[in-house]
Amino acid sequence: MNANRVRTAFFAAAALCLAAAPLAAADLKTVGSGDAMNFDPSGFREEMKSKFEIMRSKCVKCHTMERTIVAIKTGVAPISGQPFDRGATKAYGIKMLRKPDSDMNKDQVKAVVELMNYLLDEAAR
Amino acid sequence: MGVSARRSRVHRFTCAGAAFAVGTLLLATFCATPAEAIPAFSRELKTECTTCHTIFPQLNEFGQAFEKNGFVWPGGVAKSKKVKVTQTEEERKSAEFINLSGIPNTLPLSASLGLTYRYDEDKEDNFDQKFYSAELFGAGTFGGDKIGFWFNESLGGQSGGPTGPSQVWFVANHPFGVPVHLKAGRLSPDLSLWKTTLNGRMLSMGANINSFLVTSAQSGVEISSFLGSRAIAVFGVNDRNNAVGKDADGKDLAVRSVNDFYGRVGVKFGGTDFHGKEPDVDLDKDSVWDYLSISLNAFGYSGSQSGPDHVNRDVTRFGAEAEVAYKKLLLMFGATRGENDTSKAAVEITALSAEVDYVFNPMFAVALRYDHLDVDGKDPRAVVTPGVIYAPFQSVKFRLSAAIDSNPTLAATGKADKTTTAQLSATLSF
């Protein structure tokens, strides 16, 4: 009897994990290709959606979103070849904050850095 | 010159200036398209010009770090990694022979074409002064960033065209593991915070002193090293071929090779360091150092130069420079003190310069500059230079500027002691 319960619980947990796995991967879906490539924010956590709006409007001013997507998905910054991790997201955030033409304030940079960290976590899942 | 004639010229100048400004603005309106980067480094590293420049050729903080590291991307990541990420597997395999050969991925050549229209209020044919220039340059790295190289050579043009001194040099990056950059070839001494000393232009105006310029290219060897991440020291020796005089028959004696010595020490507070690392900004707290950087530099040069009588005489220069950058504002200050030995007595020279730049965006900037040259304390010359720069693309630049030059020494020759010139120049690099 106990063995049956354990077996049932095990299969239930396994089924739950299998069901959840594709959902997690789906969080980092992208749409479009090349210059028009962008994240699909439909699977983002609610508080990240507003941060994505900042990223969508500010980051593409100087470069394509593809550059960011490649960095987050591969963990390597595409131009420099340097690791793109949590340390790098803050460094890039500061670089953009100090770039005269970025027109980003600290709150906006902080929001984008938090979003990139969230996306890195999602990509690693 | 009569008052009415002067007024007429002023009026014509004003109209011409307005026409240039309107023309430039019209170009601005019709040429505005998405920025495209093209020259050699941009192609090789697959990144846009503004990674290293504000408006070319002026380097931003990252560009300065890139240059000082021998054209190696700060952070020291091997090139092969970059290739793996940016290319498909098939492309990577086809590029492997390039990596194994240790050569740049793209042909590291660029060219720059320039065209300048100049207005001179004192010339009879005010506007009929056109200058063109074409310059070829190349730069890159070999052997997985071990050796950097640079060359630039004028392909032709007219005197007055905007080309720099011809240079060909190599730089060994950290040779034998020693943390220095060793540069050799025909090079322009690295004495300045910027590509050339701020006083260079003013000192070149002192042609009545002699043609000596510390930044002119010479064969030499230069070694530079970072002291920590925010200080740099440079020392160099160059080899000038100077005549040493005439014999009893008035013939030139054999040209003698003479060594000059120079060096500089620079330090930077705030901003990106010499390794390209961003400052540690607290995103929850504001500080003036979030955007402020201050760079200081001191240099010295001791050498010799042959004058019109073909005799070698000592030349010394000492200078100090400062740069303050805050957001879109850039302030630059430079002072050079020098002494030239002559056949009579030593001539003392003092040049002071200040410039303020405001970069509205990567396409549009304004600049105002003041230069002062004093030779033996007599009749100092002053030049005020306002300018507007418009770059519709990252590789195309228009510059409209004027120079109001007060030169009292000209009064003795019967010429006007105050002259105004204006110029519109276009530069295209690819």
Predicted regions and their residues:
Chain A
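C-terminal capping alpha-helices of c-type cytochrome domains
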Residues: 101-125
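The canonical Cys-X-X-Cys-His
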Residues: 56-66, 112-116
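Extracytoplasmic/secreted proteins, especially bacterial periplasmic and envelope-associated proteins
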Residues: 50, 54, 88-91, 107, ...
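C-terminal segment of classical bacterial N-terminal signal peptides
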Residues: 16-24
